[in-house]
Amino acid sequence: MQIAIAGFLIVFSIGFISSSDQSNDKQKGAHVFGSLNATNLQPFVKNNYNWITIVPYSGQKNEDSPNLVYHRGNRLELDRRDSVWSHQIQVAHALGLKVFLKPHIWMHNPSEGKWRSDIFPTNEDNWDLWQKNYRKFILFYAKIAKKNNVELFCIGTELSRLTAEKSEFWETLIKDIRHIYSGKLTYAANWRNEFEKITFWKDLDYIGIQAYFPLTKNTYPSVEQISEGWQKHLLSIEQVHKKYNRKILFTEMGYKSTADSAIKPWEWIENYSNPKDLVSYETQANCYKAFFSQVWDKDWFEGVHIWQLRSDYSESDSTLNLDFTPQGKLAEGVISKGFE
């Protein structure tokens, strides 16, 4: 999922455990932008969420760069970051929320049409340096996960070319992480041309999917039309589940508040005033209704982390809000009811 990042951004995700027997263990989460505290977490708890995912970023110039920057290169900065993430984890745990730590790479200046799925160093020297830097980045956060008893850790997000061509690297990295961290592990694979091809699912606890599947070719689709669009994707998802005997976790899923949101759910809104981006809270709500009717109750389904909510949300934000957040919209009630 491509997003615009300004400054030092913290992303969170929250979920909760259902009272129904069939979904007692499902993760019920949503990515949330902004810092968290005991007060601004209450609306999420009220709406039946109880997992929180913290997303630390490492910066990379472009798809060819071997350098990853997640601190200023000194011990003081590392200690500060450790303190920030540890505090957020402790706030969540104090409220009874479980934590999913999910590192991402953000490219500052990618080539046209490229994003993090295209990251691939151009020669062996650059590859050696990139894997060394990525390993440091991931193990730094694995240590924070261990220190703070984090329940779930993500080894990477949407690095499609690297998972396809460098599987040995990931297998070794997983072993290195498990030497440090004893909790559950997953990887957040792109829905397109990645999750079916990964060979190291057997070494992880969940099959993670960034679930922006195209579900219709229609604007203003009905719940029935969107539900029909899920069928072919469910077949491929279930095949991977059966092959590796691992439950499926939607590490990310979301829909804009637009009439075309089920056509290409992964697309970010570039121009919020563009009249072609027609506001449709009903379409967003219909997308979630279809998800709960077609996916949620599958025995192989572990849960979902919805994109994206805000810790500083106010009701006035949603008046002309085309964005992914369900807050203050029809979808908010659909999700809350689905998570009961």
Which residue ranges define each predicted feature?
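Aromatic-rich peripheral "rim/lid" segments of glycoside hydrolase catalytic domains that contact
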Residues: 267-269, 273, 282-290, 294, ...
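Aromatic-lined substrate-binding rim segments of carbohydrate-active enzymes
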Residues: 41, 58-110, 165-186, 228, ...
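Aromatic-lined carbohydrate-recognition surfaces of secreted/lumenal glycan-active proteins
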Residues: 100-105, 154-164, 171-196, 245-253, ...
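The substrate-binding groove and active-site-proximal loops of carbohydrate-active enzymes
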Residues: 29-31, 67-82, 120-135, 156-165, ...
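Boundary/entry segment of secreted carbohydrate-active catalytic domains
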Residues: 20-47, 55
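Bacterial Sec-dependent signal peptides at the C-terminal "C-region" and cleavage site
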Residues: 1-25
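Aromatic- and acid-rich polysaccharide-binding/catalytic face
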Residues: 138-142, 148-157, 189-227, 247, ...
